[in-house]
Amino acid sequence: MRAVVQRVTSSSVQVDGNIVGSIGRGLNVLIGISKSDTLQDLKYIRDKVINLRIFEDEKDKMNLSILDVKGELLVISQFTLYGDCRKGRRPNFMEAKGGEEAEGLYKEFLSLLKESNIKIETGEFGADMKVEINNDGPVTIILDSSKNF
């Protein structure tokens, strides 16, 4: 599982011109699910997202998590995080889990996040979405449950 985590002052997502998710201060989280992902991968990424200390404390040091600042999460599925561009010029998405299986894991990931009592908004799985991200910093962290980076 991969996640691109961006610290934001606000973020929103639209489907067919309608806002389906919107947050204030918090994290915009793009989620990619691979063919080999299991519940263990979901829990690993969940724990990283909610405990990453990427918000500044009173000394301007990145020392606070989303839990500490009582921030919000906007979670959006994005299979293109598994685009492999090592060969040729067109991304290969062979490692991305597709369809109902991926949607099931995405929903399970959201359920795990909800256990932390953070306000969570989402995009619409599989939809063509327009995402507005107002980066704070900017601070962008890339997570990978297989620990490739």
From Swiss-Prot:
It catalyses: glycyl-tRNA(Ala) + H2O = tRNA(Ala) + glycine + H(+); a D-aminoacyl-tRNA + H2O = a tRNA + a D-alpha-amino acid + H(+). One of its GO terms (biological process) is D-amino acid catabolic process. GO terms for molecular function: D-tyrosyl-tRNA(Tyr) deacylase activity; Gly-tRNA(Ala) deacylase activity; Ser(Gly)-tRNA(Ala) hydrolase activity; tRNA binding. A motif (Gly-cisPro motif, important for rejection of L-amino acids) lies at residues 137-138. It comes from the Bacteria. It is found in: Cytoplasm. CDD domains: Dtyr_deacylase. InterPro entries: Daa-tRNA_deacyls_DTD, DTD-like_sf. Keywords: Cytoplasm, Hydrolase, RNA-binding, tRNA-binding. GO terms for cellular component: cytoplasm. It is an enzyme of class 3 (hydrolase). Gene3D superfamilies: D-tyrosyl-tRNA(Tyr) deacylase. The keyword Hydrolase applies. Coiled coil: none annotated. Homodimer. Belongs to the DTD family. An aminoacyl-tRNA editing enzyme that deacylates mischarged D-aminoacyl-tRNAs. Also deacylates mischarged glycyl-tRNA(Ala), protecting cells against glycine mischarging by AlaRS. Acts via tRNA-based rather than protein-based catalysis; rejects L-amino acids rather than detecting D-amino acids in the active site. By recycling D-aminoacyl-tRNA to D-amino acids and free tRNA molecules, this enzyme counteracts the toxicity associated with the formation of D-aminoacyl-tRNA entities in vivo and helps enforce protein L-homochirality. A Gly-cisPro motif from one monomer fits into the active site of the other monomer to allow specific chiral rejection of L-amino acids. This is D-aminoacyl-tRNA deacylase.
